[in-house]
Amino acid sequence: MARVTVEDAVDQIGNRFDMILVAARRARQIAVQGKDPMVDEMNDKPTVIALREIELGLVNATTLDADERQTVRDREAAEVAAVSAIAEGRTL
């Protein structure tokens, strides 16, 4: 496993504190929410994958915010469809 330095990731985000927040959010997406990594996993942990994605400019706070907004919209649409189906007496 190659050693990951955070300097390139810090340069992409702007400061190390924001970089930590972005990396943690992305790692959580990969580990807990089951989001697919945008880079080869190479048997790395989600935190290392998140840092590599940041270094390559694939992930930043804006992209994470947009992804989370889309996830909420999708979840709400599914809930509305389920409620409509129940109200009409059919099942999904």
UniProtKB/Swiss-Prot annotation:
InterPro entries in UniProt: DNA-dir_RNA_pol_omega, Pol_omega/Rpo6/RPB6, RPB6/omega-like_sf
Natural source organism: Shewanella denitrificans (strain OS217 / ATCC BAA-1090 / DSM 15013)
Documented EC number(s): 2.7.7.6
Name of the protein in its database record: DNA-directed RNA polymerase subunit omega
GO molecular function, one term: DNA-directed RNA polymerase activity
Domain of life assignment: Bacteria
Quaternary structure and interacting proteins, as annotated: The RNAP catalytic core consists of 2 alpha, 1 beta, 1 beta' and 1 omega subunit. When a sigma factor is associated with the core the holoenzyme is formed, which can initiate transcription.
Catalytic activity, as annotated: RNA(n) + a ribonucleoside 5'-triphosphate = RNA(n+1) + diphosphate
Gene3D superfamilies membership: 3.90.940.10
Function noted in UniProt: Promotes RNA polymerase assembly. Latches the N- and C-terminal regions of the beta' subunit thereby facilitating its interaction with the beta and alpha subunits.
Classification via HAMAP family: RNApol_bact_RpoZ (MF_00366)
Pfam family, one: RNA_pol_Rpb6
Family recorded in the similarity comment: Belongs to the RNA polymerase subunit omega family.
Any GO BP annotation: DNA-templated transcription
EC class name: transferase
Keyword tags: DNA-directed RNA polymerase, Nucleotidyltransferase, Transcription, Transferase
Keyword Cytoplasm listed: no
GO cellular component assignments: DNA-directed RNA polymerase complex
PANTHER family to which the protein is assigned, alphabetical: DNA-DIRECTED RNA POLYMERASE SUBUNIT OMEGA
